[in-house]
Amino acid sequence: MKRIRQPIIAVLGHVDHGKTTLLDRIRRTNVAGKEAGGITQHIGATEVPIETVKNLAGPLIKLWKGEIKLPGLLFIDTPGHEAFTSLRARGGSLADLAVLVVDINEGFQPQTIESIEILRKNRTPFIVAANKIDRIKGWKIEKDEPFLVNIKKQDQRAQQELETKLWELIGKFYEMGFQANRFDRVQNFTRELAIVPISAKYGIGVPELLVLIAGLSQKYLEEKLKIEVEGPARGTILEVREEIGLGTTIDVIIYDGTLHKDDTIVVGGKDKAIVTKIRALLKPKPLDEIRDPRFRFDQVDEVTAAAGVKIAAPGLEEALAGSPVIAARSEEEVEKAKQEILSQIQSVVISTGKVGVIVKADTLGSLEALSKELQEKNIPIRKADVGNISKTDVMEALSVKDEDPKYGVVLGFNVKVNEDAEEVAKARGVPIFTGNIIYKLIEDYEAWVKGEEEKKKRELLSKVTFPGVIRLYPDERYVFRRSHPAIVGIEVVEGRIRPGVTLIKQNGQKVGVIKSIKNRNDFVQEAKKGEAVAIAIEGAIVGRHIHPGETLYVDLSKNDVIILAKQLKNELDETDIKALKMTAKVKAQQDPFWKAV
């Protein structure tokens, strides 16, 4: 028997833009008030029955032609995008739909952009809640009022300010490749993003938001939401946690089938599939929050998707957040589920032994997302695993550092660095990058690589000798001093010269070292093709070693040529290459190596 399940809704957005406050308003509980700094600390799930939506939405429900058949909405209260990234189902996102909360006064922030990128990559449809309209100067507040009613009560100036802020948001979405508009102006919901102006604090606009979520889910996701009620359950672990009297439990979102209290389940572990039998199924009543510590769980016989459920069972200590849960009713199903889970873990948790970065993340889903981003940017991975950054990770990065310094690093998403790991990293110079925004984490790493390459280039440039060919002026007037040191006027014919380089004659004989270069009245550190300068040559005597009108060459070592060809190729311009070829011709008289240059 098939029926439509509740859509699973994720709430994303930047810190303090109002994600938890919005869910509170829908739930009429006050979770945000209990959280440290008003920020959601844990992952939770809340079931909102369709009756509650209808009561909140009132006459607005009639905006949708035909009856809404959904049993309700299942909200995941995520700490921003990290949890969304972690929560996967069969390679895609667990969420059917998302609400992106944006503070209309602050606009786009780093985690807003990260959230949009994640939603785009997962192809998850979303609605925008433009929050905190109550902070617009002079905004008249009526609690829980539909936005379309509330806007009519505002004066012209407040309405105009809202309009300006909305257009700023619409412009930002356009820059990211999305057509967006205020929800009541949207012509086609498949092509345009709907923006609902709301005040999560006072409930303004929340009725429209709920109607849109329910209506869009019904209209566009109906086929996806059809489940086989009697089929074996599938879900994703939100969190693994200790509960007094129950031991290690897992909070799970069931998105398919029905889970029974005596079912055998297969769960994703650190490097294995865990097979265990359910001891108790604990389900909160609608409108109560899984993660509320004051809540006493009800034991239930079965749970049908979509639902948030706590499972108590033996052997869950090594279960991984973000990994799959599959119910199995026969030995054959157990084996099949084990293979499926193992292949999923093995595709994400990797150890190649090749030169590449070390990647650590808090859950399987976030590890998969981070690895994917790195692969798209052609950054090789040596090891990708779940868990905090350990001393072993640092030592492995150290071995890579010896082969290729730019990959001898550890990247950690939403994880801590163990104390001993930090000590070794500092002592041995292994960079550790951590953060909770994937693109920012990769950006920081790329900026470091760029900085290191620039530093290396500067070091090489200071050590390497560039090719240069000069000609002494034929007129004796340009011989300013004959010796100790010889000072002569020259023209740079090809390439460049710097103080400290040795000069050689046409026959390869060394004549002296350039001590200084003077351009008119100033001493300079470099002279390039076409420049006329005076140079002081230590060790040369005019008339004995060098003569007016003579061509001289900057002496190069084989090492100079190798560095220039391999590491500083982009620093050589056309005239440098000409100078190199001319010098190679001179040096080839004594060493066949130079014939190949």
Curated annotation (Swiss-Prot):
Residue ranges of domain tr-type G in the record: 4-221
Nucleotide-binding as UniProt keyword: yes
Binding-site residues, GTP: 13-20, 77-81, 131-134
Region: G5, residue numbers: 199-201
Molecular-function GO term, any one: GTPase activity
GO cellular component, one term: cytoplasm
Segment forming the signal sequence: none
Region (G1): 13-20
Spans annotated as G2: 38-42
CDD domains (UniProt xref): aeIF5B_II, IF2_aeIF5B_IV, IF2_eIF5B
Matching PANTHER family: EUKARYOTIC TRANSLATION INITIATION FACTOR 5B, TRANSLATION INITIATION FACTOR IF-2-RELATED
Function text: Function in general translation initiation by promoting the binding of the formylmethionine-tRNA to ribosomes. Seems to function along with eIF-2.
Protein name (Swiss-Prot/TrEMBL): Probable translation initiation factor IF-2
Lineage of the organism: Archaea, Methanobacteriati, Methanobacteriota, Thermococci, Thermococcales
Gene name of the encoded protein: infB
